[in-house]
Swiss-Prot record:
Belongs to the insulin family. The keyword Lipid biosynthesis does not apply. Residues 1-19 form the signal peptide. It comes from the Eukaryota. Brain peptide responsible for activation of prothoracic glands to produce ecdysone in insects. Keywords: Cleavage on pair of basic residues, Disulfide bond, Hormone, Pyrrolidone carboxylic acid, Secreted, Signal. CDD domains: IlGF_insulin_bombyxin_like. GO terms for cellular component: extracellular space. The gene is BBXA9. This is Bombyxin A-9. The keyword Signal applies.
Length: 92
């Protein structure tokens, strides 16, 4: 009985570990970055941000900071350095 329990525990651990693979990272630049982001956002069902959502702020100079991802941009995160799909999706 103990052997069967040990085998079941080992198989469960192996199966769990195989699903916990790190997400692949790639470098996306230029047209490839724009196309990949558009495809991912479309698949995720996210509409493109419009200027209308920023109208309540009243000042155009606040627009870049209202959704804020610190001072970094998608080029810094995904072109200059490799990034994951999760990072790309955060820009949708």
């Amino acid at each position: 009985m103990k052997l069967l329990l040990a085998i079941a525990l080992m198989l469960t651990t192996v199966m769990w570990a195989s699903t916990q693979q790190p997400q692949a990272v790639h470098t996306y630049c230029g047209r490839h970055l724009a196309r990949t982001l558009a495809d991912l956002c479309w698949e995720a069902g996210v509409d493109k941000r419009s200027d209308a959502q920023f109208a309540s702020y009243g000042s155009a100079w606040l627009m870049p900071y209202s959704e804020g991802r610190d001072q970094r941009g998608i080029v810094d995160e995904c072109c200059l350095r490799p990034c994951s799909v999760d990072v790309l999706l955060s820009y949708c």
